[in-house]
A protein has these predicted regions:
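Proline- and acidic/polar-enriched loop/turn elements at helix boundaries
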Residues: 30, 93-94, 149
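Short hydrophobic/aromatic-rich motifs at helix boundaries and adjacent loops
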Residues: 2-6, 24-26, 48-51, 76-78, ...
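A conditional alpha-helix N-cap/helix-loop micro-motif detector
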Residues: 26, 95-99, 126
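General small-molecule cofactor/ligand-binding pocket signal
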Residues: 26-28, 90, 176
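Non-catalytic C-terminal accessory region of glycerolipid acyltransferases
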Residues: 1-21, 34-37, 60, 83, ...
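Pocket-edge structural micro-motifs
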Residues: 27-29, 47, 68, 179, ...
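A short, well-structured juxtamembrane/interface segment
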Residues: 17-42, 48-54
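Catalytic core of membrane glycerolipid acyltransferases/transacylases, capturing the structured
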Residues: 42-96, 157
């Protein structure tokens, strides 16, 4: 089993490469991301945990690092992200008091990479924004960029807590961006979390409609 777990990241890389080659992708409002980059503005991608596979596919080669948990599954995901995106993940928590992770993320931003976080991860509740991502954006002084994806050909793991989406080859996909969300020093994090949840719900519905 240990040998198989070590092989999983490499199998995932091969699968994601094949998926990228065989999927027709429509990008919606990609100019929002381009505008931030043109201004040399670092930011945090926020996406639902269930849709992280195609995020690594559609953002391969981007300067992005992802916050992953310190669990065994997190270790495996970190290796998948290293292979697929070419960056080292930050291990830890986005919660208040997780100073080590915050410092590592600050260093990553200063080195010129953007961040990727699943605000409902690592264990849910599904599609509920936790305060941690808002705290990070406030602490790091960077905007949150909502992003989502949907595929016409996929398997949904209905028994997983997040109803995990496993995209399959030879389909259509949509990658949709929302408007950046700023979190100022005096902002109410709960209100900002609700704003992000609404934004992700709206763009996810849009992405699903595009591949229906």
């Amino acid at each position: 089993m240990d040998v198989f777990r070590r092989l999983i990241p490499y199998l995932a890389y091969l699968f994601s490469s094949f998926l990228k080659l065989t999927t027709r992708v429509k990008i919606v409002r990609g100019e929002i991301r381009d505008r931030l980059r043109a201004a040399d503005q670092r930011f945090i991608y926020a996406l639902w945990h269930q849709r992280q596979v195609f995020f690594t596919v559609s953002h391969r080669g981007d300067n992005v690092t992802v916050l992953v948990s310190r669990s065994a599954d997190g270790e495996m995901m970190a290796e998948v992200i290293r292979l697929c995106c070419g960056v080292v993940s930050v291990r830890g928590s986005s919660s208040r008091g997780a100073s080590g992770a915050v410092l590592s993320l600050m260093k990553a931003l200063k080195s010129g990479v953007d961040l990727g976080i699943t605000p409902d991860g690592p264990k849910g509740p599904r599609c509920e924004v936790k305060e941690g991502v808002m705290y990070l954006a406030q602490r790091l002084g960077v905007p949150i960029l909502p992003v989502t994806n949907a595929q016409s050909n996929r398997i949904v793991l209905a028994r997983s807590w997040d109803q995990f989406h496993l995209p399959m080859p030879f389909g259509r996909a949509a990658v949709v961006y929302g408007e950046p969300i700023e979190v100022g020093p005096g902002d109410d994090l709960n209100l900002k979390a609700a704003e992000l949840k609404r934004a992700l719900a709206a763009i996810t519905s849009e992405a699903e409609a595009l591949v229906a």
